[in-house]
């Protein structure tokens, strides 16, 4: 793989199902040595994770990074809060968007870029139950149309 290309290590498919993603931001993650080894081995779960902004800093919360098998005493807590590396203007922009608007920050995927672990954070607004059903219905219709077009073109 060429330098600069992202190698996706984990995705949060549930986030796109549960939220409308308004905008996305790429952020670096502050990790310990054994954590980055676990991340490179794709032993990370984003399912229950979210990001929050406290005291002008962005933090990644509830993201599980499995302990590194050979790490023994140097392994950190798998559920610890990890700092996100964002520019000050990005943090203030996200903080302003989050104020009283029913929005949240959800991690969408973790990948390697130029050897560094990056997380794609989505500014998200929660979906209602009927929105989720509508999304599933639309996806099924598109799948059926593709199937019929494939069958039609095969003749």
Curated annotation (Swiss-Prot):
Known CDD domains for this protein? SmpB
- Renumbered to this chain, region (Disordered) spans 135-155
> Tell me, which GO biological process terms does this entry list?
trans-translation
Where would you find this protein in the cell?
Cytoplasm
| Gene3D superfamilies found in the cross-reference section | 2.40.280.10
Q: Main subcellular localization, coarse class?
A: cytoplasm
Keyword annotations of the record: Cytoplasm, RNA-binding
> SUPFAM superfamilies in the record, alphabetically?
Small protein B (SmpB)
Q: Which domain of life is it from?
A: Bacteria
**Protein task:** Required for rescue of stalled ribosomes mediated by trans-translation. Binds to transfer-messenger RNA (tmRNA), required for stable association of tmRNA with ribosomes. tmRNA and SmpB together mimic tRNA shape, replacing the anticodon stem-loop with SmpB. tmRNA is encoded by the ssrA gene; the 2 termini fold to resemble tRNA(Ala) and it encodes a 'tag peptide', a short internal open reading frame. During trans-translation Ala-aminoacylated tmRNA acts like a tRNA, entering the A-site of stalled ribosomes, displacing the stalled mRNA.
Protein name (database record): SsrA-binding protein
